[in-house]
Amino acid sequence: NKSDVLEYVALNGKPMELFDVIDEDGNKTGQVKERGVAHRDGTLHSTVHIWIVRPNQESGYDVLLQKRSECKDSNPGSYDISSAGHVSAGDELMESALREMKEELGIHAREDQLQFIGTHRGQFEAEFHGKPFRDNERSTVYLYREPVDIKNLKLQESEVEEVIWMDFEECRKGIVDGTLPNCIYEGEFQMVGKAL
């Protein structure tokens, strides 16, 4: 019954982000947690990751990376997946992926343009802005191969500082040897490489 669904919550006039708590297989447990609480407690939740790729002149691929805004609650100023975001409580994976691309980059993609390549389990603990942060996510990973001109993107300033194209192999090396400031899981990046 749609009338029994909590659709909006605010605290001091600021909208709160709610996540469905999930099990290891990605099934919703029926519990919902607020974003900050989920990240404080290390609660398992869903995210969507969209990797935008293009062929390059070296017969390889370039990957579009976004540089996270300095005001992000985790990994500020780090290079990250082309477009990524949490799945809000009650939302589906594909609608979340399409929404994130539109909100962060201004790309109006269609469902048939996203290629599902797998899921990735990511966990880490750190401290950002003086607060503990325990991420525990199950990411649904997609490739997007449509032409993208970064000059035409409309970046969400609160989320994304800039975007750059980087050669896939150069990016892989930067992730592995730590020369690229990033928050990319090496295992997920390998998954992308296998799908190219």
Task: Please annotate each region the language model reported.
Residues 3-6, 11-14, 77-79, 83, ...:
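Nudix hydrolase/Nudix homology domain
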